[in-house]
């Protein structure tokens, strides 16, 4: 009869040996990645040596915290046309801010830069913003009718109703003596507008406290996704998911998805009513969500549930957050330039009177107000950059070239502040957009350009005009001298300390 003798010493030796091997393996992997990172970085710097690059940290790159926009302006003045921007790790991209360079890139069909946009996917999925190739073309063609002018015309009244709800709330505040942080109010208003116009929502999210959960989730995801792009270690899902930022991002995504799922479910329920279904079918042009739902009904293979939600998540974000940024910065620009604000107000009063009725035709009769809106979007573009991953080499007019596989980033912020094309670029000067003025076709791109320009740009411009016109009829906008906004780079242009304005009632 044999006996098995348990030996604690042998057991501990075994455990010790396992950890030794695990440590050696981990050390090898770390060294391997370090060598790989070093070689990749050196190759990129050599390959792109014709483009200037400011000194940067070997790991964190141009780690500028909230000073990235100020640094871009320095690069624009120091380096003609383009330069290198080192992000974290071996992530180096070519930053373009010359219209001739930008025109070349936007005239091609390169895909979105996967190394950047992949981090948007857990939030907004693969909708128009992230899709490439044939599927992007199919979705773009399917959704374009949602922005036909026959669809956009009746939206003007809906936009006006949403703006007036916001202004009614402002009327009840003592905004003259107590400055108001306007971005959150404007964000709820633009969400209200997109919900009613694109998603057939009944009611007002501005009067629903639960809607603030969604706008807060979008704000968090805006920051968290941007920070992830700037952290070399966060590109690995396993590390990011275990981090505090990763957990916060997961929670915010859940809130955002619950909101969009609720919107889809509500509209599906409405269309189960035969009367509502026939009413929708008789429309000459369907709205955004109905296009998706009818496409899903007619051919379940053409559009999956994941595709549908991705498009809803994408437009829900782009249709309210970018517009909220634009409106907030326009208000600030007008507040700090009272002479232009008053001229806009007089123009609006001559067209709208007391503002009880705003129509599509009215929006085309505001030339000076439109000039001011465009100039504010030049100074404060809601989307500060777009990136492409080159599918083939590209050569620019001056002979410099970028090889295949490199990320080319169009700095819209840098482009709009390029002194070679915009003299005194920091000065608010609406005359730049006077009818008799001209500028390079690719020097002004608040809605990007080329085949992948913003599908909802006319929708957005209409909303900007309605918001500015109705606000100027009811309030004089004054800056808060104690809290001057500091623009910072995020997925959408934000202010580090909010946008605070004093509101003086006019009636």
Curated annotation (Swiss-Prot):
Keywords: Endoplasmic reticulum, Heme, Iron, Membrane, Metal-binding, Microsome, Monooxygenase, NADP, Oxidoreductase, Phosphoprotein. Gender- and strain-specific expression in kidney (at protein level). Predominantly expressed in females, the expression among strains decreasing in the following order: FVB/N > NMRI > Balb/c > 129 Sv/J > C57BL/6. Expressed at very low level in liver, kidney and spleen of both male and female C57BL/6 X CBA hybrid mice. It comes from the Eukaryota. GO terms for molecular function: heme binding; iron ion binding; monooxygenase activity; oxidoreductase activity, acting on paired donors, with incorporation or reduction of molecular oxygen. Its main location: endoplasmic reticulum. A cytochrome P450 monooxygenase involved in the metabolism of fatty acids. Mechanistically, uses molecular oxygen inserting one oxygen atom into a substrate, and reducing the second into a water molecule, with two electrons provided by NADPH via cytochrome P450 reductase (CPR; NADPH-ferrihemoprotein reductase). Catalyzes the hydroxylation of saturated carbon hydrogen bonds of fatty acids. May act as a major omega- and ommega-1 hydroxylase for dodecanoic (lauric) acid in kidney. Catalyzes with low efficiency the epoxidation of 11,12-double bond of arachidonic acid. Belongs to the cytochrome P450 family. This is Cytochrome P450 4A14. It comes from Mus musculus (Mouse).
């Amino acid at each position: 009869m044999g006996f098995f003798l348990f030996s604690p010493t042998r057991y501990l030796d075994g455990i010790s040996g396992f950890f030794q091997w695990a440590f050696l393996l981990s050390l090898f992997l770390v060294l391997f990645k370090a060598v790989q990172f070093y070689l990749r970085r050196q190759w990129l710097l050599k390959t792109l040596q014709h483009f200037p690059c400011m000194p940067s940290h070997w790991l964190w790159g141009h780690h500028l915290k909230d000073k990235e926009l100020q640094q871009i302006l320095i690069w624009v003045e120091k380096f003609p046309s383009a330069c290198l921007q080192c992000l974290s790790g071996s992530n180096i991209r070519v930053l373009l801010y010359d219209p001739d360079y930008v025109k070349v890139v936007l005239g091609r069909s390169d895909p979105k830069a996967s190394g950047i946009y992949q981090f948007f996917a857990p939030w907004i999925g693969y909708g128009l913003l992230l899709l490439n190739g044939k599927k992007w073309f199919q979705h773009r063609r399917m959704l374009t009718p949602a922005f036909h002018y026959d669809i956009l015309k009746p939206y003007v009244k809906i936009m006006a109703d949403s703006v007036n709800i916001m202004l009614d709330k402002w009327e009840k505040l003592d905004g003259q003596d107590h400055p108001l942080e306007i971005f959150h109010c404007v964000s709820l208003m633009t969400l209200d507008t997109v919900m009613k116009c694109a998603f057939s929502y009944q009611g007002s999210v501005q009067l629903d406290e639960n809607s603030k959960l969604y706008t807060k989730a979008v704000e968090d995801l805006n920051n968290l996704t941007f920070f992830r792009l700037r952290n070399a270690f966060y590109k690995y899902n396993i590390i990011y998911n275990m981090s505090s930022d990763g957990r916060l991002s997961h929670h915010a995504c859940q809130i955002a998805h619950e909101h969009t799922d609720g919107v889809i479910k509500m509209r599906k329920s409405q269309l189960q009513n035969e009367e509502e279904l026939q009413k929708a079918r008789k429309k000459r042009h369907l709205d955004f969500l109905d296009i998706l739902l009818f496409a899903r009904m007619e051919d379940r293979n053409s559009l999956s549930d994941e595709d549908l939600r991705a498009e809803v998540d994408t437009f829900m974000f782009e249709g309210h957050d970018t517009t909220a940024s634009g409106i907030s910065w326009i208000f600030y620009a007008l507040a700090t330039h009272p002479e232009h604000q008053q001229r806009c107000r007089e123009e609006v009063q001559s067209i709208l009177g007391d503002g009880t009725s705003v129509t599509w035709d009215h929006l085309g009769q505001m030339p000076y107000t439109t000039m001011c809106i465009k100039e504010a979007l030049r100074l404060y573009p809601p989307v500060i950059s777009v990136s492409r991953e080159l599918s083939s080499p590209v050569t620019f007019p001056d002979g410099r070239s970028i090889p295949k596989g490199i990320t080319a980033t169009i700095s819209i912020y840098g482009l709009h502040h390029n002194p070679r094309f915009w003299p005194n670029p920091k000065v608010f000067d609406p005359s730049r957009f006077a009818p008799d003025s001209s500028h390079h076709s690719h020097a002004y791109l608040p809605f990007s350009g080329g085949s992948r320009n913003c599908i909802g740009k006319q929708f957005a411009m209409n909303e900007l005009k309605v918001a500015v016109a109705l606000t100027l009829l009811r309030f004089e906008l004054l800056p808060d001298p104690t809290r001057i906004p500091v623009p910072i780079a995020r997925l959408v242009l934000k202010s580090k300390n909010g946008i605070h304005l004093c509101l003086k009632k006019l009636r």
